[in-house]
Design a protein with these regions (language model features):
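Long, charged amphipathic helices and adjacent flexible linkers at domain junctions
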Residues: 1-41, 90-131
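Small-residue-enriched alpha-helical segments and adjacent helix-cap loops
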Residues: 346-536, 544-547, 555
Length: 558
């Protein structure tokens, strides 16, 4: 242990010194260490330069290639997992470590096959099946979990995105999985997770299920998922926490699940005891804010021209990038720019991002496209009615004590005439395909696409605001949680043919780094959360949408 600590300390001390002509000086002191320490160091630092030579030497020292993997290589990866869990290593470093481990195994693979053929031995690692729920195309979080699990000595079977529940169960059986992990970003994924729990219960697989993604929560897991499956359903949280949960399930399943189930029982009790008091829908409508007629008057220039932009210049977006969420994605806590002065690895990641931006701009490797159409519109019975007759129903806050807001409040009431509303769809897509989704460069590109998408939305708002108070609520988010409205807007804008975006059966947008929503101008316009709604409003909304109650519950995650 003391030698390993010295090695970690040495790794942290290497600062990339430079000569007078600006060239980096290689610090090769670690090459004087023992073979085991050198292999540990290579994995911790993600350094593959000497792997072939060191592994060739290891084959002459260790009895078998299996011993090399289970010895110095896994010792290094165990340390990576520990340091990441303690917040002493960050995701960029973990990704590079995982890549180095993959390279080491690839180098040893021919010898492993020879050894296995002669002895019948195999390396046994705990197996976890990972998948993104059916209808959901967001996989970046799942890919990060996969990387972290690999660093924690798991054998990961990644089924990809939009995976049917039957396929998940079949894979768990075929691979004799120890654990199953399912992620989802959009609310319809919650109903898929509920159905998966019921299927697992029916099949009696007795394999714990870990769920994750932005749409999941400890409350939903306790109230809607856990009662459907007797053998453990846990909400994972971030990659580090998910890895910790899975390790606990392997080492101490019975007592850990008993603890989790007791906590979930408590959460269910609190949930049912503290049911929010909801106003009757008609009363919530009566309490809607009232604005004077003049507040809906907009300059004639607002919405005068529609906007269609293809292959836009990314240079226009760089200044509008919000870097703080970028660093949060990579596991750094704090705000930009202070964060790059607080963490050396954050600064390295930032420099890599800037270099990558330069590369993709020079090579025209990202496509930024946008379509915005404006419509005269009025509000009637919580619906936004466009000048072509199309109606977009909006939900209204119904919880007692809330302001009973609806986005339709910011649109001119029919009695006053009309105001102008914009509908938009936009994307920033990576033209480069066929990349290793676990590679640092790929994750960096994907995280930059996400930031540039938000920057494009910011640019759009700035270009079109005419100095007005303007909001851009996106469908599927808290003020307008119905994802199916994206289909209405895609049809109204002809977005698929104009900018090359599409929808899944659960209304997730592809490419994933895309947005769809409304542009609403009003002095009082602001973002808010609808929260819980009553059966009366839900029934009314289903009638307006001409959709079944069951389907709307799925869309809203109810």
């Amino acid at each position: 242990p003391e030698a390993t600590e010295r090695l970690i300390e040495l790794a942290e001390q290497i600062k990339g010194q430079k000569t007078a002509d600006g060239k980096a000086i290689k610090n090769e002191e670690w090459r004087t260490r023992t073979l085991s320490e050198r292999l540990n160091f290579a994995l911790i630092k993600g350094n593959t330069e000497y792997l072939e030579a060191d592994l060739a030497e290891a084959l002459t020292v260790y009895a078998s290639p299996v011993e090399i993997i289970e010895g110095p290589l896994m010792q290094g990866m165990d340390k990576v997992g520990t340091l990441f869990g303690e917040g002493k290593m960050f995701l960029p470093q973990v990704v590079k470590s995982a890549k180095a481990m993959k390279a080491a195994v690839a180098i040893l693979q021919p010898e492993i096959e020879k050894h296995n053929a002669g002895t019948g031995e195999n390396i046994q690692r705990p197996k976890v099946v990972l998948a993104t729920a059916k209808g959901d195309v967001h996989d970046i979080g799942k890919n990060i979990v996969s990387i972290v699990l690999t660093c924690n000595n798991f054998d990961v079977i990644d089924l990809g995105v939009m995976v049917d529940n039957q396929k998940i169960v079949a894979a768990a059986k075929a691979h004799q999985a120890d654990l199953i992990g399912v992620s989802g970003l959009i609310t319809p994924s919650l109903s898929e997770m509920e159905a998966l729990c019921e299927l697992l219960q029916k099949e009696q697989l007795r394999i714990p299920l870990i769920v994750g993604g932005a749409t999941t929560s400890t409350v939903h897991t306790a109230v809607k998922l856990a009662p459907r499956y007797d053998y453990g359903v846990i909400q994972g949280g971030d990659a580090s926490r998910t890895a910790g949960i899975m390790k606990r399930l392997l080492s101490d399943r019975s007592s850990y699940l008993a603890q989790v189930k007791a906590e979930q029982e408590k959460i269910r009790g609190q949930y049912y005891h503290k049911q929010d008091r909801l106003l009757p829908y008609t009363e919530a409508q009566a309490l809607a804010p009232v604005f004077d007629r003049e507040s809906y008057r907009l300059p004639a220039s607002f919405g005068e021209h529609n906007l269609l932009g293809k292959n836009m210049d990314l240079q226009d977006l760089i200044a509008k990038i919000d870097w703080t969420p970028f660093f949060h994605f990579w596991g750094f806590k704090g705000k930009f720019p202070e964060i790059i002065h607080q963490h050396e690895e954050a600064d390295r990641t930032y420099q890599a991002a800037l270099e990558m931006l330069g590369t993709v701009i020079a090579g025209n490797e990202f496509e930024a496209s946008i379509v915005v159409n404006f419509f005269d519109a009025y509000a009637e019975d919580d619906e936004i009615v466009l000048d072509n007759g199309h109606r977009l129903p909006m939900l209204r806050q119904q919880k007692a004590g809330q302001e009973c807001l609806s986005l339709s409040d910011y649109i001119c009431p029919k009695a006053y005439g009309t105001s102008t509303i914009g509908l938009f769809a936009l994307k920033v897509a990576d033209k480069q395909g066929g990349c290793d989704c676990h590679d640092f460069s790929h994750l960096l590109r994907e995280s930059l696409c996400a930031r540039l998408t938000e920057a494009l939305a910011e640019w759009m708002q700035e270009q079109l605001s005419e100095g007005l108070s303007l909001i851009r609520p996106a469908f599927g988010y808290s003020a307008c949680p119905d994802h199916s409205l994206k289909k209405d807007v895609f049809d109204l804008l002809d977005a698929p043919s104009k900018i090359g975006v599409s929808l899944t059966t659960s209304y997730a947008i592809y490419p994933t780094t895309s947005l769809c929503g409304m542009l609403i101008a009003h002095p009082a316009a602001r973002y808010f959360s609808i929260g819980k709604i009553g059966a009366d409003q839900l029934t009314d909304y289903c009638t307006k949408r001409a959709i079944t109650l069951e389907e709307e519950k799925r869309l809203l995650g109810l």
